[in-house]
Regions:
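Non-catalytic alpha-helical scaffolds and adjoining flexible linkers that form interface surfaces
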Residues: 1-21, 26-163
Length: 163
């Protein structure tokens, strides 16, 4: 059984069963971690408010068979916004599990303090290896694509983008 204490940004939290939750974290030391919160949806759960998306938290995770978040303390609340939620979803879906990335961590920390703008989404794409400046539309091979599909990991131009 391993125990980790580290700073993390809460990317997302989803319901798991009747009372449990699954939380997606991006940590300074271990990169992306998906952990279970036992009884995290109970009305008396002390972890429920600490593990809301976009919070900067100090977490304690125990890894026996699978990671379980057992303690969390808010350091800073993120400034919510549509762009920040898109960035959190991008990091949740694309970044590899268990691989630390200092550049991405530093960018996400700055976004928590200052809020996110549209250009920050492109910065995250670059850090994750999807630089739009070097990409082409997947369908027509036109340079300078306008859209990125998180689901397919593909760039599209305005003409070819289906939504």
């Amino acid at each position: 059984m391993l125990e980790y204490v580290t700073e993390a940004i809460v990317l997302d939290k989803v319901d798991l069963g009747e009372l449990d939750s699954r939380v997606y974290l991006f940590t300074r030391d271990f990169g992306k971690i998906t952990a279970k919160i036992k009884s995290g949806r109970k009305i008396i759960s002390k972890l429920a408010s600490h593990t809301e998306p976009l919070n900067l938290v100090t977490v304690r995770i125990v890894d026996k068979n699978s990671p379980q978040l057992i303690d969390a303390l808010i350091s800073k609340k993120g400034i919510p916004g549509k762009t920040f939620f898109k960035i959190a979803a991008l990091v949740r879906d694309i970044s590899p599990e268990g691989q630390s990335d200092r550049n991405l961590w530093e960018l996400l920390i700055s976004l928590i303090g200052n809020g996110a703008e549209a250009g920050d989404f492109i910065k995250v794409l670059k850090i994750l290896g999807f630089d739009p400046a070097r990409a082409k539309c997947n369908n027509c091979l036109k340079g300078s694509p306008d859209f990125f599909s998180i689901k397919d990991l593909i760039f599209y131009c305005k003409t070819c983008y289906a939504g």
